[in-house]
Amino acid sequence: EDHVKKVKIVRKLEKKHNRFICILGDLQGPKFRVGKFTNVKEQLKKNQEFTFDQNKKDGDSKRVYLPHKEIFKSISVGQRLLVNDGKVRLKVKSKSPTSIKCLVTDGGEISNNKGLNIPDTKLDLKIITPKDKKDLQLAIKLDVDWIALSFIQTTKDLLTAKKLIPSKFKVMVKVEKPSAMDEIESITENCDGIMVARGDLGVETNPEDVPIHQRTMVAACRKFGRPCIVATQMLESMIDSPTPTRAEASDVATAVFQGVDAVMLSAESAAGNYPKEAVEMMDKIIKRVESDSKYLANIQNYNLDHTKTSTEAIATAALEVASIASCNCIATFSQ
């Protein structure tokens, strides 16, 4: 009911302000969580052993139930398991069909139903879960514009999921798994848009790798003419502050200079104390970058390593003419 109400509000505002607003239906995808603990939470210490198993009994400081058989099947010795957004890190020492014995490499708190990430493992799982199918039907009923797919690992995952989505809906791939980067060009070519989902991607990769992955995804989107969204922690401090940090302003500006099509707010507008100010600040940064003389030159100078079609050639020429003549808009024929 909440989603239905919000969609109606957006469509009403579209008419009021005469602006087209895209609505994206975000499918959660496969989400892994640990079981429960007798004492609700436990403190794991570095270098201790800890086991994930198929025993449904409440956990303690030495073990916990993991209700995902596909992990036991796919994970290998030496691979990592990350709990609580990567705050607790473990490495697999040994495994059996019903048990994964680990060494804690970074200790911390683990508690009931905390999320689990497996960055080094390609899992054999259903990308569209039963919950996703139910949510997809609601998205179709609400006539959203885009469907976002979470935790896509391979092109095969994408193509399998697309079979369940009516062709009238655009498909956005949220790149959250490092394994997706191995096939990023193929994934980009076979979807309608890419979201650089830096939250889960940042948990499963090293912090220094995330900016490189972002540039790679933006380049792939430019190569295949796909929209690209950069998301997560863009103005994170504005959840509690009316102004961003200088680093956050620079982060947003860098994404715009790279040529992305959209920058996205998450908790800043969904749960923050300054949602209006966060949107206004994001808008100011975008407009400031786009008014910079080097911005257009930067965009035009990107190397597109594919053969330009006649349509692309005409569009490129139209862009240059519009820039030189300071045109407010470009009119095109749809057929």
PLM region descriptions:
Residues 1-335:
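Non-catalytic helical/linker scaffolds that mediate oligomerization, partner binding
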